[in-house]
Amino acid sequence: MKFFKITTLIISLIVLTSCQGPGVNGDEDRKQVTILGVMIGEQQEKIEQALAPFTEATGIEVVYEGVDTFATTLPIRVDSGRAPDLAMFPQPGLMADFAREGKLVPLGEILTPEEMTEAYDQAWLDLAAVDGTVYGVWYRASVKSLVWFNPQEFAANGYEVPGTWEEMMALSQRLIDKGKTPWCLGIESGNATGWVGTDWVEDIMLRTASPATYDQWVAHDIPFNDRRVENALDIFGEITQNEKMIYGGKVGALSTPFGDSILGLFTDPPHCYLHRQGNFIAAFLPADVDDDQVDIFPLPPIEEEYGLPILVAGDIFAMFNDTPEARQLMAYLASSRPHEVAATLGAYISPHKNIDLNLYPDRLTRKQAEILNKAEVIRFDASDMMPGAVGTGTFWSGMVDYIGGADGTQVLNTIERSWPR
């Protein structure tokens, strides 16, 4: 959706809403929109730059507040009658809770279905929907199904980028046979330790079971200890339960901070040759690593029938207070303009379908965006969609236990018992 088209929509909204009564928690003369979000520091500065053209075009001030306690701060604000006009959710699960409580305005009251599909592929609209109704506008995507490697080391040793899981595991065994370590894995992440392991299992589930089965798993329509989940965990174990597969073995995997685990690709000699992690790990690359020393490929398919799905995360806007200004801002966020601005600033990938790849400032980001754009199947991080007691509780801790050597069946049974009844 081009900016001039959205500008026309914004003008139309001004005319339409000027005839209406006051919006929720607002009034006709209001010239400000408030946002509560998770981006702070440098990321907050970037989103404020992306929002600036809206203020320039409309004269409406956008007040963005970034907090690192979003999941607790937002419910308190809403319950006390001080909801922000818009919230930027780091995952759609919490958004869905507010939607089901009737706290959010459906996007269909602002944009037509045609305008939505012009801006986003159906997969992203499905992820923004709650019980069939779209509520959110996606702003940023994280591409998680990536394997990082040092192309100079591959070229020097005659290694080829694997196109299938079987080829990737054959390369891993080839490295072991030469006395080398295939993988670097670090899952330590403070209070969030374990999420690296959940990402692995989710990615494998998408490659060994249908998207519908994945959705059933997330919704607990199948139990957590279902045989298909156990199969995914077993495949993960082919890497984690083999001390020769990962640098430092189990102890190294459990104790290495996730941001440090990619560093092994660039030591001399390399500590490892493969590292699976999302696009955000680029922020942890050593400053002295040149562009020709790092590359990526999508985590390969396992079962041919399920193709090459991509596991994603992302940030999504939804509207609490139905004011003319908030409607205009939601329309702007669905246009290509804020995404184009953000793309040029780096450390960002847009889920919007109309973003020129040449806007991204570096080769790696363009490649990540291209992988996302080509994906026929995308699914959101499962742990972010599950109840907190599981997704950020027993699923995380279960991965720590499993990597440490616990029996996989027992781990899955423990997680299943923890699911809220």
Swiss-Prot record:
Phenotype on disruption: Inactivation of the gene results in loss of the ability to take up glucosylglycerol and sucrose, as well as to accumulate exogenous trehalose. Insertion causes leakage of glucosylglycerol from the cells into the medium.
GO cellular component, one term: plasma membrane
Pfam families: SBP_bac_1
Lineage top rank: taxon: Bacteria
UniProt keyword annotations, A-Z: Cell membrane, Lipoprotein, Membrane, Palmitate, Signal, Sugar transport, Transport
Induction: Expression is very low in cells grown in basal medium but increases significantly after a salt shock.
Residue positions of covalent lipid attachment, annotated as N-palmitoyl cysteine: C19
Residue positions of covalent lipid attachment, annotated as S-diacylglycerol cysteine: C19
Compartment(s) where it occurs, according to its Swiss-Prot or TrEMBL record: Cell membrane
Signal sequence annotation: 1-18
Membrane-topology descriptor: Lipid-anchor
Assembly information from the UniProt record: The complex is composed of two ATP-binding proteins (GgtA), two transmembrane proteins (GgtC and GgtD) and a solute-binding protein (GgtB).
Family designation: Belongs to the bacterial solute-binding protein 1 family.
Record function comment: Part of the ABC transporter complex GgtABCD involved in the uptake of the osmoprotective compounds glucosylglycerol (GG), sucrose and trehalose. Binds glucosylglycerol and exhibits a somewhat lower affinity towards sucrose and a substantially lower affinity towards trehalose.
PANTHER family: ARABINOSE-BINDING PROTEIN-RELATED, OSMOPROTECTIVE COMPOUNDS-BINDING PROTEIN GGTB
Protein's name in the database: Osmoprotective compounds-binding protein GgtB
Organism (species): Synechocystis sp. (strain ATCC 27184 / PCC 6803 / Kazusa)
